């Protein structure tokens, strides 16, 4: 079942001179299995929105349901995995194992069941078992992000909610997170990610929700977003589209910009080589 928001409004410092309207009359429906990107500038209301999904924040008006239930219910909280923008802010246990096990133990699962979930989540997040005894805060930024992700996955969530999961990571860390999310999406998990920059996520998203000043100004597919918002294709995407129009399929894996350029240059070199061979063959035929 979906997440449904109806006429949601959220205020900070309500009924004071400092009152701020963070969300205004938001209506949104997220279906099971979707990969949704929530896009907007800093302060637009993105992070406020996702805090509603598992009851971290209550709306001042309107109604939200997750699988038909109130998001503050224990059943919903156990099915919604959250990963925050700064992984260090949610990593507080002494070891990676304890960190990943925290959620299942907190929701009453046995130690045996919890151990199974820890190893399952570890693999899903592409982490090595040798890391289980390490201090989470001693890890690299990308590794900490994946530990936080594993902690969310240990709940076997129906919904995975991510707040700027690749912000601040180096290219290798970003690639690891994106490839992990692609794998998780293939298992049928609903993924909702907040971002101020679609770079990296764009090939994975099935729907984009654009928030401006607390209101949803657009929601639709990637194609609709680019047409409606007049988004120019970056050079790499333009080149890939040109190759596809010629019937040339480029490896659809999640690329870094450098990898995409290498792939495109490889294919273009192949085209030029075939063209040269064809011209030589035609010249020999004429002789």
Swiss-Prot record:
- CDD domains in the cross-refs: ABC_cobalt_CbiO_domain1
Q: What is the lineage of its organism?
A: Archaea, Methanobacteriati, Methanobacteriota, Stenosarchaea group, Methanomicrobia
Functional note: Probably part of an ABC transporter complex. Responsible for energy coupling to the transport system.
Quote the subcellular location field of this record.
Answer: Cell membrane
Q: Which family does it belong to?
A: Belongs to the ABC transporter superfamily.
Keyword Phosphoprotein in the entry? The reply is no
Which Gene Ontology terms cover its molecular function? ATP binding; ATP hydrolysis activity; ATPase-coupled transmembrane transporter activity
> Which cysteines does the record link by disulfide bonds?
none
**Which organism does this sequence originate in?**
Methanosarcina mazei (strain ATCC BAA-159 / DSM 3647 / Goe1 / Go1 / JCM 11833 / OCM 88) (Methanosarcina frisia)
Q: How does it sit in the membrane?
A: Peripheral membrane protein
Name of this protein: Putative ABC transporter ATP-binding protein MM_1038
Ranges for domain ABC transporter: 5-238
Q: Name one Pfam family in it.
A: ABC_tran
